[in-house]
């Protein structure tokens, strides 16, 4: 039996939970697993870290009631308690994770100069470094989801017009745009680094490749981003989600309207985008406090 099946069997046979309750637990585990599969890859329940859980809860919490989010965390805590007790995982990643009551955590983001610092640090000219620079630049310039960037094909790129046709969630297509600086990094990758990486899969249409010349996985991209930011001295926990948050925050801080940002992010519901207005207001408040002459 899989770890999920063992847990569900335990709930049904040892705890005598109703079929409806067992199904609710099953759905909560499936939702978390699906999120990780689409945002970095699912390495197995025994490899999920506290950071993975925090990112999942942050992303999910933007569109759920606090009571629903609490239930999802409770399901994961119960699951990992059983796995830990039976020696099926070495550590419980849910330990010490708590939700703020009645208040959603604001998305973490990087400022423009911080992203610029990271991009400038990727300057040794090696194929993987050139690839990583293009990845970071595109995440920040477009606000794409990790799964969307991972699945990018050459035919989706319009370099001349600085556009990308993105195949988003629910098979919904949209266009995103990139600036001249990002175009420069992308072209350098496509013209110089990508051909040198293209070894075992000469016919692949995937834009971003791993060191073996094969399409890179979401997990590979997430790991690369984390290592890049850690090496640049900014944080040990950077994730592509935070570059997406950074894009949205930068757009709003520079005057973009909420509906436009919603379209660029591919959000179905405007309320999902509205959380970034709180981030922007927080930024504006800090700027006011710092620069207004009367304290």
Curated annotation (Swiss-Prot):
Pfam families: Phage_int_SAM_1, Phage_integrase. Keywords: Cell cycle, Cell division, Chromosome partition, Cytoplasm, DNA integration, DNA recombination, DNA-binding. PROSITE patterns: CB, TYR_RECOMBINASE. GO terms for molecular function: DNA binding; tyrosine-based site-specific recombinase activity. It is found in: Cytoplasm. InterPro entries: CB, DNA_brk_join_enz, Integrase-like_cat_sf, Integrase_catalytic, Integrase_recombinase_N, Integrase_SAM-like_N, Recomb_XerC, Tyrosine_recombinase_XerC/XerD. It comes from the Bacteria. GO terms for biological process: cell division; chromosome segregation; DNA transposition. Gene3D superfamilies: 1.10.150.130, Intergrase catalytic core. Its main location: cytoplasm. SUPFAM superfamilies: DNA breaking-rejoining enzymes. The active site is at residues 145, 169, 241, 244, 267, 276. Residues 105-289 form the Tyr recombinase domain. Residues 1-84 form the Core-binding (CB) domain. GO terms for cellular component: cytoplasm. Forms a cyclic heterotetrameric complex composed of two molecules of XerC and two molecules of XerD. Belongs to the 'phage' integrase family. XerC subfamily. Site-specific tyrosine recombinase, which acts by catalyzing the cutting and rejoining of the recombining DNA molecules. The XerC-XerD complex is essential to convert dimers of the bacterial chromosome into monomers to permit their segregation at cell division. It also contributes to the segregational stability of plasmids. NCBIfam families: recomb_XerA_Arch, recomb_XerC. This is Tyrosine recombinase XerC.
